């Protein structure tokens, strides 16, 4: 190795130029509070409630030569531990189940998206909201 190359390598490594940033640029995968909506077409009202969901950044990779190799599965922020809570929609007619169950995130992890328990789609054009008149303000954490 030439003197100039050695000097450049020493400067790069000595000044920390080859190190990754110390803190994340985006929030990592973790439980966060979110307001969701619950409704049933047979019941007269919709309820908005606050619960904890998994959200945040998961490190991912994209192949430089995508045609040569199969795609790399991209991890998503998903539940590690969860519990289920439920709310009762008021004013439902007899014979209609007024209970709506939903997951409450206790801890999260980066992993494959499981369609059985997660919505693996991208951002929505419109946030989830009530189509019916709603009763706001329930909190489930």
From Swiss-Prot:
Keywords: Disulfide bond, Glycoprotein, Hormone, Secreted, Signal. It is found in: Secreted. GO terms for biological process: G protein-coupled receptor signaling pathway. InterPro entries: Cystine-knot_cytokine, Glyco_hormone_CN, Gonadotropin_bsu, Gonadotropin_bsu_CS. Disulfide bonds join 29-77, 43-92, 46-130, 54-108, 58-110, 113-120. The keyword Zinc-finger does not apply. The keyword Glycoprotein applies. GO terms for cellular component: cytoplasm; extracellular space. It comes from the Eukaryota. Glycans are attached at residue 33. SUPFAM superfamilies: Cystine-knot cytokines. GO terms for molecular function: hormone activity. Residues 1-18 form the signal peptide. Belongs to the glycoprotein hormones subunit beta family. Heterodimer of a common alpha chain and a unique beta chain which confers biological specificity to thyrotropin, lutropin, follitropin and gonadotropin. Promotes spermatogenesis and ovulation by stimulating the testes and ovaries to synthesize steroids. This is Lutropin subunit beta. It comes from Oryctolagus cuniculus (Rabbit). The lineage of its organism: Eukaryota, Metazoa, Chordata, Craniata, Vertebrata.
